[in-house]
């Protein structure tokens, strides 16, 4: 997608080198916005193959209100495993297990998963129980009864519980907007890992917009992506430069099961990606 490559190029050309929490180092800018009209296709990156299975399972996990990686691990999605594994490695119970062996223990033992697989009150907890408020339910009800409301805001940032989370929310605030019977969504993301995270976030919130539009009866509008600290880790420079040599291809189409009328009823099998023709994947190490 041109919007994504423009962001990456802008950071590489104009970003500032900064230190960061992980000790890796980044090139960073502050304040950037991208627009995606969903009538142009599903915004899944074509300049490298992107893990849609992980994106959809993670979103379903959020909607369930789940905060334990067991659901993800059971579905062979390891995008959140690094953080609890690091926590386990620092414990007295660690006996040299690899991350694969740790994942196997999560998969095989409910007791082990309960003790070591929970991330604290991260996204799913805040979406479904922010100090007792089910924000998803509120937004769905408001879209159905008062779609011109300016209060259709979903927040994952709960200052009182940040210290209990293994990783504080990066994509923090969502707002819905309706005009001409079209539903749009804007995301504010406080921190964006441009190589590994941002492609996931674009696709994830596009899927979320499609799901919410379907269950509330609206047509699709636009996804607006606003990023605070947009950064490229120094150990991803080569991967980003490779992507910048690739010409974006036609966007795919994401089909979803039209019979679903409740967000909670969606399953992975209800999504079908059509016409996806990406370049080969590009690997990169996540900064934990």
UniProtKB/Swiss-Prot annotation:
The keyword Cytoplasm applies. GO terms for biological process: dTMP biosynthetic process; dTTP biosynthetic process; methylation. Pathway: Pyrimidine metabolism; dTTP biosynthesis. SUPFAM superfamilies: Thymidylate synthase/dCMP hydroxymethylase. GO terms for cellular component: cytosol. It holds the Pfam family Thymidylat_synt. Keywords: Cytoplasm, Methyltransferase, Nucleotide biosynthesis, Transferase. It is found in: Cytoplasm. The active site is at 170 (nucleophile). Catalyzes the reductive methylation of 2'-deoxyuridine-5'-monophosphate (dUMP) to 2'-deoxythymidine-5'-monophosphate (dTMP) while utilizing 5,10-methylenetetrahydrofolate (mTHF) as the methyl donor and reductant in the reaction, yielding dihydrofolate (DHF) as a by-product. This enzymatic reaction provides an intracellular de novo source of dTMP, an essential precursor for DNA biosynthesis. Belongs to the thymidylate synthase family. Bacterial-type ThyA subfamily. Homodimer. This is Thymidylate synthase. It comes from Acholeplasma laidlawii (strain PG-8A). The lineage of its organism: Bacteria, Bacillati, Mycoplasmatota, Mollicutes, Acholeplasmatales. The gene is thyA.
